[in-house]
A protein has these predicted regions:
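Bacterial N-terminal signal peptides
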Residues: 11-21
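Solvent-exposed adhesion/ligand-recognition segments of exported proteins
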Residues: 23-238
Length: 238
């Protein structure tokens, strides 16, 4: 009797661990990262990224070995106090932030070998709207996605360049971004920037302002060459 109970207990524990690993595989902080990014989830099960402590320039760097967003969406916690989100309701303060230490730029850098599947909304819990750069050299598939409370949103297959703690630009050598049939809603952001070696459009991108840079290139934070969104079918900038 004890053996049967023990076997059932072990089976339950295994299934719980297995399910946690499957969930965690969608979003995994790079174990080799030097930054203190932590993962959590809301009471309703929405994944939360407690962003790393920003430097004195207001830059928060967050490195992942796997980075994906499913239909539940995802919350970037840039708040030093309890706050309410659209996706996950009430969220506790980010323990990595001291009072008045919110980031003004959040970099999400994927160091693994898989492309990112972005199939839900990304929301920033932040007193002020924040800039976000999502970088994955392996590529990104974006479908039925959008942003909430993000000022400027950049998705790229390039390498993010930093100098003296400042973001200075992006170098692109490879990588494909695919916009899926359900498209991307960027209307909550001031502008959306897509920077990749190649871009494949299967659906619409709707934004207030859209910048697209393709091919092998280097862009800076102050000067880049972009394709006019009006020249690309399926892309609409108000």
């Amino acid at each position: 009797m004890r053996n049967k109970f023990f076997k059932k207990f072990i089976t339950v524990i295994f299934l719980l661990i297995y399910n946690i690993e499957i969930f965690a595989a969608n979003l995994v902080v790079d174990p080799n990262s030097n930054y203190n990014t932590k993962l959590d989830e809301s009471a309703s099960g929405v994944p939360i990224v407690n962003i790393s402590t920003p430097n004195d320039r207001g830059l928060s760097i967050n490195e992942f070995s796997e980075y994906n967003i499913d239909e539940k969406g995802q919350i970037l916690n840039n708040a030093d106090n309890v706050g309410r989100t659209h996706l996950g309701g009430l969220i506790n303060a980010n323990p990595n932030l001291a009072p008045n230490q919110a980031a003004n730029l959040i970099i999400l850098q994927v160091n693994g070998s898989n492309r990112s599947q972005i199939e839900g909304y990304l929301e920033a819990l932040s007193r002020e709207r924040v800039d976000v750069i999502l970088s994955n050299e392996n590529g990104l598939y974006i479908n039925n996605a959008g942003t909430i409370n993000i000022k400027n949103f950049t998705v790229t297959t390039g390498k993010v360049n930093l100098k003296d703690g400042d973001f200075i630009g992006i170098d692109v050598e490879k990588g494909n971004i695919v916009i899926g049939p359900k498209g991307m809603d960027g209307t909550n952001a001031n502008y959306v920037e897509i920077i990749a070696k190649t871009l494949e459009l299967r659906g619409n991108v709707v934004t207030n302002d859209l910048k697209v840079v393709t091919g092998s290139n280097s862009t800076t934070s102050t000067n880049n060459i972009a394709i006019d969104a009006k020249e690309l079918g399926g892309m609409y900038a108000n």
